[in-house]
Structures are given as C-alpha cells and as structure tokens.
C-alpha cells in the first residue's frame, strides 16, 4: 500500500511538472500606469527537444517574428516591441484590444514573458493549452501604490485573462 501511494504521488507530480510544456502559449496584454518608455520586454523560450525547431510569434493573428533553432541547451530570446503587449492608453484598458501574443511551435517548449520598467521587473510564465477552459481562479496579495503604504485606499491589484476561443 505504501509503495502504491508513493507511486501515485510521484505520477501526480510528474504529470503536473510538464503542465507548462506545450506547442502553443498565450500572453495577455498589460497596462503601464507610469507610461515608462524605458521598458524592455522579451519572450524567453526553452525546450528539452534535441532537434532544433522554430516558434512563430503572433499578434492579432499576424506573425511579428520567428524564433529559429530552438533546442535543448540553446534557449532563445525575442524582444517584443511595446505596442504589441503593453498599453498606457486608458481607453484600451478593460476593452477588446489587438494587444497580446500567441506563440506557436513545431514541438513542445516552455515560454515566459520578461519585462521591466524603471525600478521593477516581472516574469510571466504561460501554461500553454493546459490553461484553456471556462473556469479561472485568481489569488493575489495586496500591493500598495507608491508612497501609499499607510493609506489602505491606495491598493493596486491586477489580473489578466485572455480568451483564445469564442465562448470560453
């Protein structure tokens, strides 16, 4: 019984460890309240496939770039122009937009979006096709706006969800 439980536990963790390993990945658009033009953003992709392959990067169903020769031991970066992923225009926030990225590879790969502004950086990891569905759960901690740590009304939080298919 103990061996069976250990095997099932191991099997559970192994299947979950590849949840971010897929042939397609999506990144939702983001908003920049500071309108920082010094921001840098890029896609970082890696794989455990030994045969090199390519990954196409789409914005609004148009290819904006291609990563070539992705293979095990040779991760790649692709710098993303700001207008494809980040907006500071208030009319585009909470509205249907043409921002966001869709990555499609010939084989399975891991993908994350890395970006930074003046004094802050983030890494967003895509779950791939395993994130498709109709039920989403969000959990986050409180984040105070700058110079408002004592003001409980100065909270800031963000959740970004992207619909990749109709009726999802």
What label would you give each PLM region?
Residues 1-23:
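Bacterial Sec-dependent N-terminal signal peptides
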Residues 20-168:
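Conserved functional hotspot residues at active sites or interaction interfaces
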């Amino acid at each position: 019984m103990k061996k069976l439980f250990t095997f099932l536990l191991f099997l559970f963790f192994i299947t979950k460890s590849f949840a971010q390993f897929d042939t397609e990945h999506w990144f939702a658009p983001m908003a920049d309240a500071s309108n920082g033009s010094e921001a840098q953003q890029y896609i970082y992709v890696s794989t455990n496939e030994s045969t090199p392959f390519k990954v196409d990067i789409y914005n609004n169903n148009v290819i904006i770039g291609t990563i070539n020769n992705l293979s095990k031991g040779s991760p790649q970066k692709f710098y993303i122009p700001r207008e494809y992923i980040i907006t500071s225009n208030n009319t585009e926030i909470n509205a249907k937009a043409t921002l966001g990225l869709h990555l499609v590879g010939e084989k399975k790969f891991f993908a994350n979006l890395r970006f930074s502004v003046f004094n802050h950086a983030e890494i967003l990891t895509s779950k791939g096709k395993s994130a498709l569905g109709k039920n989403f759960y969000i959990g986050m901690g409180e984040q105070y706006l700058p110079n408002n740590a004592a003001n409980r009304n100065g909270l800031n939080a963000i959740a970004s969800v992207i619909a990749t298919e109709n009726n999802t």
